[in-house]
Amino acid sequence: MDKLNAISIFCKVIETQSFTLAAKQQNISVAMASKLVSQLEEHLKTRLLQRTTRKIMPTEAGMMYYQRCQGILLDLDEADSSITQLTSSLQGNLLISVPRDFGLLFIAPNLPTFMAKHPHLHIEVEFNDKKIDLLSEGYDLALRIGYMEDSSLVSRKIGTTTVHFAASPNYLETNGIPQTPDDLEHHNGLLYKNAMNQVNWVGSRINQTQRFKIQSKVVSNSGFALLNMAKAGLGIANLPKFILGRAFEKGELIEILPEYKQQKLEIHVVYPNRRHLPIKVTGISLNF
């Protein structure tokens, strides 16, 4: 039995209340339509339709099965449509929010190529670290870094990053290299302050978790600003690897306490949990 075809013809019979009309819509014979529904009933070991000479009605089990299968068939049609339209040009207006530093590094440089492929799409991009309510504020899509709290959003993981302590060679030469977390209390901290106002540093060594204390010399919501301050020798920064990576490679910054690994941060693309999302949203989400 072709189960998907059997389910499809069964749903059509419910909707048209006719094997003849259902068979015509599916481009099969009436005999084949009847056979598929009978095979489905045999497979489920229950009667789905009450057949009389005048009309066809679903049984209680049949109506329950129809309601569940109808949703599945709609999802399949939507999946087919999204892939088909993904290969063509997207269109419409799109409002998205991305973390400031991540967006400037990875989203902004790739927008020209993406927009050239989809010239009928108009995108408004907000580069900020504010935690937004996608539905109430009218956003179509957002990128988020860190723990996902809002279960009402659909999310898709697109990567991970790690966080590291770092300072310039000049700063460490002048102030000494911290050997233990307790040593951090005697250093200048360049602290990142996100929308949740979390400026505490937490790391783990083996199976031990420890909270690091440090005096805040500068607090900022810009990772790039803190990066430049750290390179200038102002203090010790604690930033994601995607911001620090090039400075590490060039020797402009040195990692501190590398044995204290901080929790990995997951990067997600998120969008509202709406059943029939516009193709422009699903299309662009698959491009991340």
Curated annotation (Swiss-Prot):
List the molecular function annotations (GO) for this entry: DNA-binding transcription factor activity; sequence-specific DNA binding
Q: Which domain of life is it from?
A: Bacteria
Q: What is this protein called?
A: Uncharacterized HTH-type transcriptional regulator HI_1364
**What family, per the record?**
Belongs to the LysR transcriptional regulatory family.
Q: Which PROSITE patterns match?
A: HTH_LYSR
Domain (HTH lysR-type): residue spans on this chain: 1-59
**What's in the keyword line of the UniProt record?**
DNA-binding, Transcription, Transcription regulation
Q: Does the keyword Ubl conjugation apply?
A: no
**Record keyword Transcription regulation present:** yes
Quote the SUPFAM superfamilies the UniProt record gives: Periplasmic binding protein-like II, Winged helix' DNA-binding domain
List the Gene3D superfamilies.
Answer: 3.40.190.290, Winged helix-like DNA-binding domain superfamily/Winged helix DNA-binding domain
Task: Share an example GO biological-process annotation for this protein.
Answer: DNA-templated transcription
The record ties this protein, via InterPro entries, to: LysR_subst-bd, Tscrpt_reg_HTH_LysR, WH-like_DNA-bd_sf, WH_DNA-bd_sf
User: Where's the DNA-binding part?
Assistant: 19-38
